[in-house]
C-alpha cells in the first residue's frame, strides 16, 4: 500500500465544486491582483485569528521579512531565532540586514526555550522570533513577558500552526505581528505560494501594505523603498473556500495524531511528540525522534510509506550561514534533532486504513 506524505489532490477533490466556482468568479471579474477577494479574505482571516488586521503577501517568508521591516528592524540589529527551524525564519532576518541569533529549543515542543532567550539578549537585540514548530505553539506568555521587559518586538512565525491555540487563544493574537504561510502543504494551503501578516496595530498593518506594493499607496507615487509581495486574487479566493474547512481539517489531524500516539506508545527506539497542557497543536507534522532514524525511514520507504525529515541540516551548519562561524557542536540540541527526527504522514485526508499501514510498518521495522 502506497501512503504519500500528504495528498493535496484529495484536498482539492473534497472542495472541487466550491474551488472551481471561486476560480471562475475571479477569472470572470477581470481583476487579478488586490481586489475584492483579497479584501474579503483579509477580513475573514483576521477574524479567524482573533485579530484586528490582516495583510496578505506573496509568501510566508515575505510575511516575516515585511513584519520585521515595518517594525524598524534592520542593519546592526540582532533577532533571536530558534536553532531548530526551517531556514526561512533566519533568511527573513538576514534579508532586512539584521543578524540571526540562534537559541536552543526546550525539550517538550522543541520551540524556543524562554530561559535561554533571556540569556541571549544583548544591547543589539531588536526582536524575538519564535516559531510554532510542527503546529505546537511556543510559550507566548513567557516570551511576551521577556519582550516587554527588554523593550523588544515579538514576531510570531505561524507558518506551521494556523488554527493552533495557546492557553485558549489562537496563535497570532499575542504579539506585535504574526506571519503565516499558505504554501500548498500547510494546514491552510493555497494553490501556490502565499502568506499573510496579522496584527492588532493599525499603523503597522498600513506600513506592511505600503511595503508589499513597491512602497506605494497611489499609483506611481512611491513613499518608501518597498517590494513586490502581493497575493493574487485566485489564491485569495481559494483560501477563502479552504478557511471555512480549516477547523474541521485540523480536528481530523488531531484524531490521527491521537491514533498514532495510542498505537505507537510502546514501540521501542522511538520517542513520540509531546504537547504542553496549555497548548492545542494544529498537528501540521507528526514528528518522531528515532534511535535509528535512517534505518527506519528506509524500512518505511520500502513499504510504500513516504516520510520526510524536518530538518536534516541545522541552519547554522548550512553553507548559507557559514559566515556566522558556528561550527558543529555549537547547538547540540538542534544537531541531535537533525539526526533523529522523522515525520510520518498526517493530514485531513489520510485514511484510517493508511494510518494503520504506517503503524504496522513502523512496528515491524523498529
UniProtKB/Swiss-Prot annotation:
The family assignment reads: Belongs to the DegT/DnrJ/EryC1 family.
**UniProt entry keywords in alphabetical sequence:** Antibiotic biosynthesis, Cell membrane, DNA-binding, Membrane, Pyridoxal phosphate, Transcription, Transcription regulation, Two-component regulatory system
Task: Please give the superkingdom of this protein's source.
Answer: Bacteria
Please give the Gene Ontology molecular function terms for this protein: DNA binding; pyridoxal phosphate binding; transaminase activity
Which Gene Ontology cellular component annotation is one that this UniProt entry carries? plasma membrane
Keyword set includes Glycoprotein: no
The subcellular location is:
Cell membrane
What the entry lists under PANTHER family is as follows: 3-OXO-GLUCOSE-6-PHOSPHATE:GLUTAMATE AMINOTRANSFERASE, TRANSAMINASE
Origin species: Saccharopolyspora erythraea (strain ATCC 11635 / DSM 40517 / JCM 4748 / NBRC 13426 / NCIMB 8594 / NRRL 2338)
Residue ranges: DNA binding: 160-179
What Pfam families would the database entry show?
DegT_DnrJ_EryC1
- Would you tell me the protein name for this molecule? Erythromycin biosynthesis sensory transduction protein EryC1
Membrane topology of the entry: Peripheral membrane protein
Q: What is the lineage of its organism?
A: Bacteria, Bacillati, Actinomycetota, Actinomycetes, Pseudonocardiales
Task: Look up keyword DNA-binding and say if it applies.
Answer: yes
Residue positions, PTM N6-(pyridoxal phosphate)lysine: 186
Give the GO biological process terms.
Answer: antibiotic biosynthetic process; phosphorelay signal transduction system; polysaccharide biosynthetic process
Q: What are the start and end residues of every segment in region (Hydrophobic)?
A: 53-158
Q: Which InterPro entries match?
A: DegT/StrS_aminotransferase, PyrdxlP-dep_Trfase, PyrdxlP-dep_Trfase_major, PyrdxlP-dep_Trfase_small
Amino acid at each position: 500500500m502506497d501512503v504519500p506524505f500528504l495528498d493535496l489532490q484529495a484536498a482539492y477533490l473534497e472542495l472541487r465544486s466550491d474551488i472551481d466556482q471561486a476560480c471562475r468568479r475571479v477569472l470572470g471579474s477581470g481583476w487579478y491582483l488586490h481586489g475584492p477577494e483579497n479584501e474579503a479574505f483579509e477580513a475573514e482571516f483576521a477574524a479567524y485569528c482573533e485579530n484586528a488586521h490582516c495583510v496578505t503577501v506573496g509568501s510566508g517568508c515575505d510575511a516575516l521579512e515585511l513584519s520585521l521591516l515595518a517594525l524598524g528592524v534592520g542593519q546592526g540589529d540582532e533577532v533571536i531565532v530558534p536553532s531548530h527551524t526551517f531556514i526561512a525564519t533566519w533568511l527573513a532576518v538576514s534579508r532586512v540586514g539584521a543578524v540571526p541569533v540562534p537559541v536552543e529549543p526546550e525539550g517538550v515542543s522543541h520551540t524556543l526555550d524562554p530561559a535561554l532567550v533571556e540569556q541571549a539578549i544583548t544591547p543589539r537585540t531588536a526582536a524575538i522570533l519564535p516559531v510554532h514548530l510542527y503546529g505546537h505553539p511556543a510559550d507566548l506568555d513567557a516570551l511576551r513577558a521577556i519582550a516587554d521587559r527588554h523593550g523588544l518586538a515579538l514576531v510570531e512565525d505561524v507558518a506551521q500552526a494556523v488554527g493552533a491555540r495557546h492557553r485558549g487563544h489562537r496563535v497570532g493574537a499575542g504579539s506585535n505581528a504574526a506571519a503565516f504561510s499558505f504554501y500548498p502543504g500547510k494546514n491552510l494551503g493555497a494553490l501556490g505560494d502565499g502568506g499573510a501578516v496579522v496584527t492588532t496595530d493599525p499603523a503597522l498593518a498600513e506600513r506592511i501594505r505600503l511595503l508589499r506594493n513597491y512602497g506605494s499607496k497611489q499609483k506611481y507615487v512611491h513613499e518608501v523603498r518597498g517590494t513586490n509581495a502581493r497575493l493574487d486574487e485566485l489564491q485569495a479566493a481559494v483560501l477563502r473556500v479552504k478557511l471555512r474547512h480549516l477547523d474541521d481539517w485540523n480536528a481530523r489531524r488531531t484524531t490521527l495524531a491521537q491514533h498514532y500516539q495510542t498505537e505507537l506508545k510502546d514501540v521501542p527506539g522511538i520517542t513520540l511528540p509531546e504537547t504542553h497542557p496549555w497548548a492545542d497543536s494544529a498537528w501540521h507534522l507528526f514528528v518522531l525522534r528515532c534511535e535509528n532514524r535512517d534505518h527506519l525511514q528506509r524500512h518505511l520507504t520500502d513499504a510504500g510509506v513516504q516520510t520526510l525529515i524536518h530538518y536534516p541540516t541545522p541552519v547554522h551548519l548550512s553553507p548559507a550561514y557559514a559566515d556566522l562561524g558556528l561550527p558543529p557542536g555549537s547547538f547540540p540540541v538542534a544537531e541531535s534533532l537533525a539526526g533523529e527526527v522523522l515525520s510520518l504522514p498526517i493530514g485531513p485526508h489520510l485514511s484510517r486504513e493508511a494510518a494503520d499501514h504506517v503503524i504496522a510498518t513502523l512496528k515491524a521495522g523498529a
